[in-house]
């Protein structure tokens, strides 16, 4: 079904608005995925703070012009699904990577983070970024281990002083 010019402009504006507020983007080929599976993916995406849209290539190229995701323009071939992470940079990559494992015919093409194109082979780099809570927990564990080590060294120095006296 052909889209009217007003509809095309609305789609471009919607995707452009999503791109401006996004931290990262992932492009995938959804050819062969059933409607039920796509509906499940969209539901999971909403819960994860990820915006997903299947858009015509010409429209998505216009939508990402002037954004950090312009580097993805070369990947807009064939059926294009674009996912923007709004809350965490790795959310869309993690979501689509897990979905691709479950679906044999779902292929991730590329991703973008801070204006850098990330090929599909390196998608793990983005998917494995810790969430804010995970990063905070890692930091606290580092601080805890550092203070425990300092405490042990202080006790060892105190023991050495008492032995010397």
UniProtKB/Swiss-Prot annotation:
Keywords, in A-Z order: Ribonucleoprotein, Ribosomal protein, RNA-binding, rRNA-binding
InterPro entries: Ribosomal_uL10, Ribosomal_uL10-like_sf, Ribosomal_uL10_bac, Ribosomal_uL10_bac_type, Ribosomal_uL10_CS_bac
Pfam assignment, any one: Ribosomal_L10
Disulfide bonds, paired cysteine numbers: none
GO cellular component: large ribosomal subunit
GO molecular function, one term: large ribosomal subunit rRNA binding
SUPFAM superfamilies documented for this protein: Ribosomal protein L10-like
Annotated GO biological process: translation
Family: Belongs to the universal ribosomal protein uL10 family.
Job description of the protein: Forms part of the ribosomal stalk, playing a central role in the interaction of the ribosome with GTP-bound translation factors.
Oligomer and partners: Part of the ribosomal stalk of the 50S ribosomal subunit. The N-terminus interacts with L11 and the large rRNA to form the base of the stalk. The C-terminus forms an elongated spine to which L12 dimers bind in a sequential fashion forming a multimeric L10(L12)X complex.
Protein name: Large ribosomal subunit protein uL10
Species lineage: Bacteria, Pseudomonadati, Pseudomonadota, Gammaproteobacteria, Alteromonadales
């Amino acid at each position: 079904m052909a889209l009217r010019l007003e509809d095309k402009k609305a789609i471009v504006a919607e995707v452009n608005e999503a791109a401006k507020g996004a931290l990262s983007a992932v492009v995938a080929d959804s050819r062969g995925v059933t409607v039920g599976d796509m509906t499940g993916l969209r539901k999971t995406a909403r819960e994860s703070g990820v915006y997903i849209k299947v858009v015509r290539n010409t429209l998505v190229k216009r939508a990402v012009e002037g954004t950090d995701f312009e580097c993805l323009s070369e990947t807009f071939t064939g059926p294009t699904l674009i996912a923007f992470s709004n809350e965490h940079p790795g959310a869309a990559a993690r979501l689509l990577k897990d979905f691709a494992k479950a679906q044999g015919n779902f292929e991730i093409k590329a991703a973008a983070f801070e204006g850098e194109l990330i090929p599909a082979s390196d998608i793990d780099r983005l998917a494995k970024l810790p969430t804010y809570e995970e990063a905070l927990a890692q930091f606290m564990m580092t601080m805890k281990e550092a203070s425990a080590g300092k405490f042990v060294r202080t006790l060892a120095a105190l023991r050495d002083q008492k032995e010397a006296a």
